[in-house]
Amino acid sequence: MNIFNTNPFKAVSFVESAVKKALETSGYLIADCKYDGVRGNIVVDNVAEAAWLSRVSKFIPALEHLNGFDKRWQQLLNDDRCIFPDGFMLDGELMVKGVDFNTGSGLLRTKWVKRDNMGFHLTNVPTKLTPKGREVIDGKFEFHLDPKRLSVRLYAVMPIHIAESGEDYDVQNLLMPYHVEAMRSLLVEYFPEIEWLIAETYEVYDMDSLTELYEEKRAEGHEGLIVKDPQGIYKRGKKSGWWKLKPECEADGIIQGVNWGTEGLANEGKVIGFSVLLETGRLVDANNISRALMDEFTSNVKAHGEDFYNGWACQVNYMEATPDGSLRHPSFEKFRGTEDNPQEKM
């Protein structure tokens, strides 16, 4: 398969004036639950070859065994109920069932089987005992996530020629769920081992109802909402028409160095975060990490050197951007690279 830039629709930061305008025009808004997962694009071409890709069109390490030809994709494309028989792209959120976001995203980025992920691997791997009686893996094996552990929340589907073209898909947000459900019913039938779901979605008719729904979903443990203009279409890239309603904004960047705890305070001698060069060109200190991460990062730096994490791709969260472009309360959120290549954003 020819891998292309999938460039899915990415929600922009919440802008109340723009959202109110969409509400006035349509009389209501679509509000989808925002899931804490890894954005994924599943591309299936006309010869039934599939590619499981990240939002920046990189192969997802733990799902590489699902790439390539599968007779079931061929059967699905040939099914009279398939609305895109020449191929399609699915856009959604990938999650690992039964674990939190950090664990799940870590598993999806994982390249090799280790003791702590053996339970999620598709098959058993041989083990052996060390002279001290510790069980270790006997050899080196690529990590293949068991598809039964995989959950996919679908946002959109489009024909492959539109996906390849990079053009917007002229289907309104209010109609997209019907297209998604038409495909989801087939996915459930042909690939029952994977959990295929549609994003939990609501219609809200005023801003107060939107606020109430947001607070309700936050209380349930969700990240927030994706608010959609019902009459807007599926666009490519970060465009207005989908808005993120969540406590924090996010930015991607590259680690330039580590930040150490202040002398005389409790975190003295520990790595408390990173100096990160954002894609915008601004350098920020992204700290506010857990004690467990402090211990992990400090241990790695002491073992491998202070430049161990330099060049790693990461995500920084922040409350808002000021008019001069600086960020309020930036904090380290997660690494964006793969286990095999932490410097390449997935």
Swiss-Prot record:
A Pfam short name: DNA_ligase_C
Positions contributing to ATP binding: D32, C33, K34, Y35, R39, R55, V56, S57, E93, E142, R149, K238, K244
Transmembrane segments: none
Residues at the catalytic site: K34
Enzyme class: ligase
Molecular function, one GO term: ATP binding
Known function: DNA ligase, which is expressed in the early stage of lytic development, has been implicated in T7 DNA synthesis and genetic recombination. It may also play a role in T7 DNA repair.
Name of the protein this chain belongs to: DNA ligase
Organism whose genome encodes this protein: Enterobacteria phage T3
Taxonomic lineage from the root: Viruses, Duplodnaviria, Heunggongvirae, Uroviricota, Caudoviricetes
